[in-house]
Amino acid sequence: MNVSYGVYVSPSAAAGTLPTTYLQLHKTSGTNQQSVLNFTNLTIARTQCTLNTDAVVPFGDVTPSQTSSGDGIKVQSSLGVNCTNEAGAPTAISYSVTQKTQAGDKYTLPMTLMAGGGIVGDIRGFLGANAATDAGCATNASSVPMDSTKVGLRSISGNESWSEPLVWVLCPKATAEPGRATAAASIDVYW
C-alpha cells in the first residue's frame, strides 16, 4: 500500500508555524476495527530561502564633474540566495525591491537630502550577468524594478545557493544642493 499526503497553503495565508501533523489509517471489517498505520509528528517538506546583500551602499562624495558625465556613480555588489527545497519539487524563486523613502518611478529610487529632503539624484539597480555592462543612468534589460514588482530569478528542484552580480548606480542631479543624502529600500525573496 502506498500512502501520500499533501498540505495546501493559500497564497494569501499569513506566515506562521506548521502545526503538529498526524496521519492515521484504520481498517474496518464489520464491527472489527484495526489501526493499520499511525504516524505522529510528520514532517512537511518545504522550501525556505535566505537573501544576502550589502545592507549599506556607500556612493561617497559626489563632485560636480560626476553630475554632468551621465554615467552615474557605480557600486559593485551581489545578491546571494540560499534555498533549501526539501520536497524536491520545482519551485520558482523571485525577488522584489520596495522603496522605503520617497517613491520614484518604476526603476528609480530618489536619494534625498537628510536636511531639507530635496532630491539630489536617483538610484538605479542592475542585476544579472549583464549588470556591469548595462549599469548607467538609463533603463536596460537588467534594470531592477523599484516598485515591488516580483521578478523571477530561477526555478530550483533541490538545495541551491547562488550569487547574482548587482550594480547600484547613483545618477546625481546637476541642480542638487550639497549635503548628506540617503535613500532606503528593502529586497525580499519569494518562493
What annotation goes with each model-predicted range?
Residues 69-141:
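Surface-exposed interaction patch
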Residues 68, 114, 153-161:
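Short proline/glycine- and polar residue-rich coil/turn motifs
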Residues 56-70:
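Beta-sheet-dominated interaction scaffolds and their linkers
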Residues 13-22, 71-78, 161-164, 175-184:
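Short, solvent-exposed loop/turn segments enriched in Ser/Thr/Gly
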Residues 41, 184-190:
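Short, low-complexity, Pro/Ser/Thr/Gly-rich segments in the mature regions of secreted, periplasmic
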Residues 2-11, 162-174:
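Short edge beta-strand/strand-turn motifs with a hydrophobic/aromatic core
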Residues 1-48, 64-65:
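N-terminal export/ancillary region detector
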Residues 48-58:
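Proline-enriched interdomain boundary motifs that mark the N-terminal boundary
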